[in-house]
Amino acid sequence: MAPFIPSSHTAIIQHDDAGGVKITPGLPLPVLEPGQVLVKTAAVALNPCDFKMPQRFSQAGTYNGCDYAGTVVQLTEEVEKNGLLKVGDRIFAACVGNNPHDKDSGSFAEYLKGTAKFCWKIPDWMSFEEAAGLSGTCIATACMSLFQSLKLPGTFEEPATKPLDVLIWGGASSVGTTMIQMVKLLGHRAITTCSPKNFELVKSYGADAVFDYRSPTCAADIKKLTRNSLKYVVDPFSDLRTMALADEAMGRSGGKYVALESYQDTHDKKSKLIERELIMGQMILGRAIKLPGDYGKPENPEMGRWGVECYKSVQRLVDDRKLRPHPLRILDGGLEAILDGLEMLKRREVAAEKIVVRL
């Protein structure tokens, strides 16, 4: 029997051009484009971008939220023909939420639209909450950073035979533990920073070496460990302090620095040897990102084709239990709990955990 699909639903959307969001009932269901599916949302995960993006790129009526897990309830004709998904499939992925050019794209909703070729099927043994917690946003960001920006040798199927050192700043964050796992799966050494209380946590995800980011000798200690040869850095924070420390830890010949936030270059002598790049997870889709400043990106169909193959590789990792979510803090309460969780993130009350909300 076909699943019941209502004529309207409730979602969290921006209610003004100042970045405020609120729960809004009576909204029409998302309009599906070719290749998309309608998903009944079961769980969502929260990211800092979920409160930052409405503040930076505000436009009334735009849906909020990225990471989700749920059940497919409707297919477009293209998906019916290609057979990528079927009604009843449990899937997880990430929407491009807070998108002023695709306003009803967002996961903080009773129903959402997902692109079939950029979704993963949830194994029978995995819960919706765990799947949402794997975070499509973190996975896409990690893949873009490690493969497309750093261009590390090796694949998940055929890891590198000569390990390289990769510094992941902030390893106790959800993107940090995702990066650590993927660096190890690619056959490389994962070096990271965090608070001493989280040393054992990041080691449990595979970190080979971990340093206290507050230590006055942090960068020097990393440089000593890597014998002044570190060439690869990923920095989720990308502020002047973390950039300066990353530069100091980098080897004598410089290297590649991946920023996950818009950054201001230090323009010191060392920085001339360092190539910097801003990476966002949604770049993996190959679509144009129509945002101002550094966040704007042109359409890249070749990237999108690579992204599809990358998602297939990640599906195999998930199926083989080689990728696990960040420690979860699960909240009940539906959309109201999402708003509570966003406030917790704003107040920096969440550390070394991923907030997941059941809908």
Swiss-Prot record:
Q: Which InterPro entries does the entry mention?
A: ADH-like_C, ADH-like_N, GroES-like_sf, NAD(P)-bd_dom_sf, PKS_ER, Trans-enoyl_RdTase-like
Which keywords describe this protein according to UniProt? Answer: NADP, Nucleotide-binding, Oxidoreductase
The disulfide bridges present are none
| Keyword Nucleotide-binding appears in the UniProt entry | yes
Q: Which pathway or pathways does this protein act in?
A: Secondary metabolite biosynthesis
What positions does the entry give for substrate binding? 137-144, 281-285
What does the induction field say?
Answer: Expressed exclusively during fungal penetration of host leaves, the time point at which plant defense reactions are triggered.
Broad class of enzyme this protein falls into: oxidoreductase
Gene Ontology molecular functions: nucleotide binding; oxidoreductase activity, acting on NAD(P)H
Question: Might you give the EC number(s) for this enzyme?
Answer: 1.-.-.-
Highest taxon, organism lineage: Eukaryota
For the ligand (NADP(+)), the binding residues are: 49-52, 195-198, 213, 260-261, 350-351
Family, per entry: Belongs to the zinc-containing alcohol dehydrogenase family.
How this chain assembles, per its entry, is: Monomer.
Role of this protein: Trans-enoyl reductase; part of the gene cluster that mediates the biosynthesis of a tyrosine-derived cytochalasan acting as a fungal signal recognized by resistant rice plants and leads to avirulence in Pi33 resistant rice cultivars. The first step in the pathway is catalyzed by the hybrid PKS-NRPS ACE1, assisted by the enoyl reductase RAP1, that are responsible for fusion of the tyrosine precursor and the polyketide backbone.
Protein name (database record): Trans-enoyl reductase RAP1
Q: What is the lineage of its organism?
A: Eukaryota, Fungi, Dikarya, Ascomycota, Pezizomycotina
